[in-house]
Amino acid sequence: MNGHGKSWDIWLTLGRCLVVAVTIVAAPPLLPGQESLSTPQSKVERKNKAPVSREILRVKLPKPVEAKLKNGLTVLILEDHPAPFVNVQLHIGGAGALFEPANMAGLASTTAHMLREGSQTRTSIQIAEEIDRLGAALSAGASFGSPDAVLSASGLSDNFDQWFSVATDVLLHPSFPVEELEKMKQRQRVQLREQRSAPGFLLDERFHRAVYGEHPAANVAPTLASLDAISQAALIQWHRERYAPQDAILGIAGDVRAKNLIAKLEKQLAGWKKTEVTETWPRNPTAATERKVFLVDRPNSVQTTLALGNIAIDRLNPDYPSMVVMNHVIGGGASSRLFLNLREEKGYTYGVYSDFSALRYAGPWRAGGNLRTEVTQGALTEFFNEIRRIQDEKVPAAELEASKRSIVASFALSLEQPARVLSFAIAIKLYGLPADYWDAYPAKIMAVSADDVQRVARKYLNPDSLQVVAVGDADKIKPILEQYGKVEVFDANGVPLGAKP
């Protein structure tokens, strides 16, 4: 405790005798639905030295004050008074792209982005100027594949009531002006055309379609046709039917008083009425049972952009901690096997990685990177070699220990960000995790054994059923890819090219 009230000091055991308090400071919000599940790199990780001793790191995250408003809105409040700053995250279940009509890809994200473009009493310019004058930040989005729309805001606690009032206004009373909608759609059209020349986008698009098939998560962007179908009336209807308080979670962290704030929220959000939302969840994605190879042709490209992977687990799968450790060993950081092999030893690439998505439905594990065209053959060989190696050989004790300690150290560093701690609290609600999940997280990671790593590698990284996706010069790399299976070739617009020689 300190003179300003409750402290978020978290005591971390970093050695046998050394105890350090990590004080949480303000940072931009990181949203649970948008975060990558691979372990963040740190300076310590790049040096392959994790600053956590063999003692298991023990943390006890602050528990939020929780309330349910009369309209059904769940509110989570984390008080932190030393810094005069407040972070707000609002997750609106059922308003995400996962539920949008098949012919209107981008409806959810466009609706969310348009919240800032005008309310019943403010123009887009007035909203922007008022937020800037208050020194605040306000944004909204709905990621492809996500079941939620997310509104984020932050600013000083001294003028919290003012900037939160603007956020409430755009949430409850958007006008979706036609002229602003047309401007946004035109910007999206330009962006789509530009993305057709970006190998990273082409890879993501084809990889998602390869692993997700007919699942809505296969979409990574709107199409020109779907943008044409999105109208002001469609936005109004989506907002009216999907933005419901009983399916939403409002998280607030910072220099606020929970008791006083809950009473304010009850009044300020009283106009947000319940709406019956029908959430028809698509069937859970399943892993492919046979290997397929896909190639997006970029004539004269000097590099191959490569990914290989398959559907793995959802967030509640008990294999999650083992997957975190396995992924870290094979490709989760600069000390990983793929990085040391393909970059440090072979010099094939400046960066190579692996990660996995585990949300409320099963997502893919994937590995990949950008490679010089002439080393495509060697790189593919090494990708499969490393996958077979982690399946056939148990990870040595020292390597396993270093990986687990690095994961725990990165987790500890993330607790310095109040927005991140708020995201952890929201994640417990979103995924139905135990209340003490994050307190026990370091111990769960440290409990992962070499047998566990080998088991999940064998279970989810079957080389014979991985989906292989490459973007590059088909004339040069198609013969190489054919060694791994029949190659389906597409142009940059996604049109099949048939039996291109």
Q: Whereabouts are the PLM-identified features?
A:
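Bacterial N-terminal signal peptides
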Residues: G15-P29
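Peptidyl-prolyl cis-trans isomerase
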Residues: H173-F176, L181, A229-Q232
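A short, acidic, amphipathic alpha-helical segment used as a generic capping/interface helix at domain edges
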Residues: A234, S449-R455
